[in-house]
Regions:
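Hydrophobic alpha-helical segments within soluble ligand-binding/sensing domains
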Residues: 193-220, 240, 271-279, 337-355
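N-terminal helix-turn-helix
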Residues: 36-70
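Flexible loop/turn connectors
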Residues: 22, 279-378
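Extreme N-terminal segment that seeds HTH/winged-HTH DNA-binding domains in transcriptional regulators
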Residues: 1-47, 85-91
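Periplasmic-binding protein-like
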Residues: 100, 153-160, 219-222, 285-295, ...
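Flexible loop/hinge segments that line or gate small-molecule binding clefts
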Residues: 159-205, 321-332
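Amphipathic helical "hinge" segments at domain boundaries
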Residues: 17, 84-154
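An alpha-beta-alpha
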Residues: 206-247, 359-376
Length: 378
């Protein structure tokens, strides 16, 4: 496609720019509506008989111009510039200073302090908070988002459910440039602000505590969740700790089929199933010296079964999280996440997103390793 240069000479427009202009024109004319998926790089290469490198350049130009949003594993979608009006453009309707908070659940061992911190930050900034719990269900998470959007919230703080698939409704919010901050569980590869813990480093340090004590036959224990980022990061940190000692973690010792700590499968029925699984595992693997549990409640199940079998020894279980202590010592050596900081920073990031300010994409809150014998004196 030739066009006139500055002095009237003809110059050839690069193929990638021709493709870029064509798709941009289609977006502006409504051929591709906001939120609609556009052809992939491979499709464009076939359509225009060009290399994938050429089509990739065109897609990059569209993304850099904020005309499309690229979601790994999902495709590229037309960004909706009109879907979200910033607070300063809104009138003062009741919903304009509401923040939607969606958690998959919370307990004394985790998330209560996050929630309190978000609430305090909302009050400090003159916002109100509306809370919904998804109970670990993608459908309930979607319903909560729809309900709160209809209620008029101007942004979301979301603890995504444990699932290998990302919630399509959250991805739609991203495409629409609706302010969203995720906490605890990161949507890797998706351009969404995140506040949480460096689970790889925390797990690596916690496992190193056991290895330093001389333990080698260590069982990694996690729920039977899908390949969620948080759990996979903790598993990876566990493996890295072994590598630090020139060792390889024995996956035959791992327990990864428990489900009673997941929100959608809580209850006595599932708890008894998990106890039976652990009991059998202990009988089959008498060589296990210690356990690294990815969650506090899994550590409680392990302790119960070990005591029942007469095999429990002090400090043979480490875990993530634990109830806040008051004049007492920790039941297990564990990772204490910076919940209050996570809550405060998630609100700060959300407000920056709402007002269109520059903000970091990822914030890692500090954590601590609390030894079993340490006391919290308030």
């Amino acid at each position: 496609m030739p066009e006139k240069g500055a002095e009237g000479t003809m110059k050839q427009v690069p193929l990638y720019e021709q493709i870029y202009r064509t798709i941009l024109s289609d977006i502006e004319s409504g051929v591709y509506a906001p939120g609609e998926k556009i052809p992939s790089e491979n499709d464009l290469a076939d359509i225009y008989h060009v290399s994938r490198i050429t089509s990739k350049k065109a897609m990059k130009m569209l993304a850099e111009g904020n005309r499309i949003i690229r979601l790994p594993g999902k495709g590229s979608f037309v960004a909706d510039e009109k879907a979200f009006k910033r607070p300063e453009e809104k009138n003062t309707e009741q919903g304009s200073r509401l923040i939607g908070v969606i958690l998959d659940g919370f307990s004394p061992s985790f998330a209560c302090n996050i929630l309190n911190s978000i609430q305090e930050s909302c009050e400090e900034k003159g916002y109100s908070m509306v809370l919904r719990c998804s109970g670990g269900s993608l459908n309930k998470e979607t319903q909560a988002i729809e309900e709160l959007v209809n209620l008029g919230v101007c942004g979301f703080i979301i603890m995504c459910v444990h699932d290998e698939n990302y919630n399509e409704r959250i991805l739609q919010l991203v495409i629409e440039h609706f302010p969203v901050v995720t906490i605890d569980r990161q949507l890797k590869g998706i351009s969404v602000p995140f506040v949480g813990t460096d689970n790889v480093s925390a797990s690596r340090e916690l496992t190193g505590y056991l290895l330093e004590k001389g333990c080698r036959k260590i069982s990694f224990v996690r729920p039977k969740a899908h390949e969620t980022v948080t759990l996979m990061d903790r598993q990876y940190g566990f493996q890295l700790a072994f590598n630090d000692y020139g060792l390889i973690a024995d996956e035959a010792l791992w327990i990864t089929s428990l489900c009673s700590t997941l929100p959608e499968t809580m209850g006595d029925k599932y708890l008894q199933q998990d106890i039976a699984i652990v009991d059998q595992y202990l009988r089959e693997h008498e060589e296990i010296e210690a356990f690294m549990a990815s969650e506090y409640n899994l550590a409680k199940i392990l302790k119960y079964c070990l005591e029942k079998a007469g095999r429990y020894k002090e400090d043979m279980i480490v875990c993530f999280d634990g109830p806040e202590l008051f004049l007492g010592e920790a039941e297990f050596t564990h990772v204490a996440q910076g919940e209050k900081i996570i809550g405060k920073m998630s609100m700060e990031l959300l407000l920056k997103t709402i007002h269109g300010e520059e903000r970091p994409g990822t914030v890692m809150a500090p954590y601590r390793i609390i030894k079993r014998y340490e006391r919290n004196w308030g």
